[in-house]
Amino acid sequence: MAEYKKIVLLKGLESMEDYQFRTVKSLLRKELKLTKKLQEDYDRIQLADWMEDKFPKYAGLDKLIKVCEHIKDLKDLAKKLKTEKAKVQKKKQGKCKTAVKKKGQDELSSSESLFINKESYKSVPSSKKKGKAIAKTEGEKKNKLTQDQDHLPETSGTDIKTEEDCLQNSPKPPPTSPSSSSNKKKRKEITKTEGGKKKKLTQEQAQLPEPLGTDIKKDEDCLQTPPKPPPTPPSSSLNKKRKSRREEETGVKKSKAAKEPDQPPCCEEPTARCQSPILHSSSSASSNIPSATNQKPQPQNQNIPRGAVLHSEPLTVMVLTATDPFEYESPEHEVKNMFHATVATVSQYFHVKVFNINLKEKFTKKNFIIISNYFESKGILEINETSSVLKADPDQMIEVPNNIIRNANASPKICDIQKGTSGAVFYGVFTLHKKKVKTQNTSYEIKDGSGSIEVEGSGQWHNINCKEGDKLHLFCFHLKRERGQPKLVCGDHSFVKIKVTKAGKKKEASTVLSSTKNEEENNYPKDGIKVEMPDYHV
């Protein structure tokens, strides 16, 4: 995925002019779920990080190509991005084929080695193996058996064949014939006189009669046919050697058969690995939000909105602000408590809804905390009872740039709020221009240098104690349009913090002074108060 991100950032976003870049951000705003604030603040690097998190397969390259194709000045750039993407895919396919070919060659060489070992084992004459077993006998018995072999040269092969037939057909083998023992002694003598394996093999082949070799070959074929080797009597060294060879051949077959079923998956594994997209999870402070590739099933919690994404990766942040806890009505119509906070990483800031008021002490200004198992919805983080919030160690602290802190404390312009889409969430501090109390709700008109907009407060935000000129700090208010006119309305998690200003105090003081003056005029006569003094006589 790193190759695709390089294309998006270095050959895509960096090649655009500022106006073109702002156009691309505007067209991708809904797909990337960018708030108006994030849309304005994001630079090319931050947008590339965000696209990588939202579209992990190709780091958002397909989305960027699609948008560029609809912009007249960026059509050539779209073709260039397609070409670069094709180069990366071709390169990856070549690596996959090379890996599969190399894997197949390794397995083929191992199979050939196994086959050669088996064939070389078969090519060794049975007389050589039997000669080794015969070489162990000692003493006078050797000489006696050697003399007996001169009388029966023609029947040795027949006797060996008969012996093998008996081994296959009867549960107990017959005793070894003298001719078989004489053959053993004959091979033993050849072994002693020659001293080398090659010379010994040559003389054995020369002295043994032809029927003997034929019968031994048939004997080998017969030994491979039965499912179980025949029982070996302790007195027969020849039968022991045949049984040993039979077991070794069976073991080779089993080991080869056990390896063969595993070969196709081994060859296919590199191909599947190359075709599957590699998903990366960003847990560093420079990234925006850890990727949703590490998402877990969302626990059943009524505070979590539909479409929220669970992030289990830890994220280190610095606390900028936090409100006091306040009550809100849950979807189960229960009264619960929560508070709002603002946190920041090294690259951006986040508004946070905290539904566990036991964490209030940790959300102290300039505290460094590590959050995990939290949710993200519309760019706002949500922390509940299942989330983890830990205090960061000194070596885990981060340095938040001043421009990030300034952007977090800044309020959006009202003209920008009016241009927003319905359902967008806004935070900020605004001056109260007018207040109109109605039966069901209260209309608060806020104003700044760019324009004015109505804020509709209901429920606990109906007719709050504020005066014209006061500052209203709005948290989590939603944009709504009625008859084409935009206005901000409160939701379940909305909160208002009132900051009384000097203008508001002066307004209130002048109102009180005016009402006092009217009261005095109404209660006191114009001619003043006439007081009669009693006469005192001494």
Swiss-Prot record:
SUPFAM superfamilies: DEATH domain, HIN-2000 domain-like. Residues 120-306 are annotated as: Disordered. Keywords: Growth regulation, Nucleus. The keyword Disulfide bond does not apply. Changing residue 483 to S: In strain: BALB/cAn. GO terms for biological process: activation of innate immune response; cellular response to interferon-beta; negative regulation of cell growth. Highest expression observed in spleen and thymus with moderate levels in bone marrow, lung, skin and heart, low levels in muscle, liver and intestine and little or no expression in brain and pancreas. Transmembrane segments: none annotated. GO terms for cellular component: nucleus. PANTHER family: INTERFERON-INDUCIBLE PROTEIN AIM2 FAMILY MEMBER (PTHR12200), PYRIN AND HIN DOMAIN-CONTAINING PROTEIN 1 (PTHR12200:SF25). This is Myeloid cell nuclear differentiation antigen-like protein. It comes from Mus musculus (Mouse). The gene is Mndal.
